[in-house]
Curated annotation (Swiss-Prot):
Main EC class the enzyme belongs to: hydrolase
Domain of life: Eukaryota
Localisation per UniProt entry: Secreted
Tissue specificity note: Expressed by the venom gland.
Keywords assigned: Hydrolase, Metal-binding, Metalloprotease, Protease, Secreted, Toxin, Zinc
UniProt source species: Proatheris superciliaris (Lowland swamp viper)
BP GO terms, sorted: proteolysis
EC number(s) per entry: 3.4.24.-
Protein name: 50 kDa venom protease
Listed transmembrane segments: none
Length: 28
């Protein structure tokens, strides 16, 4: 995820690729 907040969140829950889906939804 390009977003710092989502990136940190992904690291906490250890989502990984799922973060990209959320990131795209947030950015676009």
């Amino acid at each position: 995820a390009s977003d710092v907040t989502l990136n940190s969140f992904a690291e906490d829950v250890t989502v990984g690729e799922c973060c990209d889906c959320v990131d795209l939804t947030t950015v676009y």
